[in-house]
Amino acid sequence: MTSSGVLCLLGALSLQVLLLQPPGAQGAPNPDNSHSSSPAPPQTAQHLSQKSLKRETLKPAAHLVGDPSVQDSIHWRANTDHAFLRHGFSLSNNSLLVPTSGLYFVYSQVVFSGASCSEITPTLLYLSHEVLLFSSKYQVHVPLLSAQKSVCSGTQGPWMRSVYQGAVFLLTQGDRLSTYTDGVSHLLQSPSSVFFGAFAL
């Protein structure tokens, strides 16, 4: 073979080797990566938690319990015995102040108890518990939830009656929620028996 033939053979082999190499190795840009950016840094648990917190809407909520040291009325309190005020709710003059307008589930429970009923004069004992709304729309206390119980009609010995109420209401910012109870002297004052609250839906 002549020297010119050897040179032609070497050139053909070199071209074949170049064609077999990936585009990046040939000095040409890779069409698949020409517009790709550098890989994003790994996200830490803290970053993910912050993003989740931003996405989550923090809704107002409140849960109050009765003060067992007050016997002649229900004195609501927060920040004790699993009671709390969150995300705008406040407690003023024994009333819950609604922070924002919207739908709320309002609830309350009381438990009445007594040692016995009089055998001589077994008159009925009426018990009631209400959740009241005071709003700029009405300027009076309007009952939202109301329930009544009666005892001692032929009943002897210790007795107990529980009242739980709850429903959804459309409330306005600035509305005040309070309670009224008839038969306070018979209340079983404990955090798990006497409570009052609301939370936004």
From Swiss-Prot:
Biased composition (Polar residues): 31-51
InterPro entries: TNF, TNF_beta, TNF_CS, TNF_dom, Tumour_necrosis_fac-like_dom
Protein name as it appears in the record: Lymphotoxin-alpha
Disulfide bond annotation, renumbered to this chain: 117-152
UniProt-listed PROSITE patterns: THD_1, THD_2
Source organism of this protein record: Notamacropus eugenii
Major subcellular location class: secreted
First and last residue of the signal peptide: 1-27
Region (Disordered): 23-52
Entry-linked CDD domains: TNF
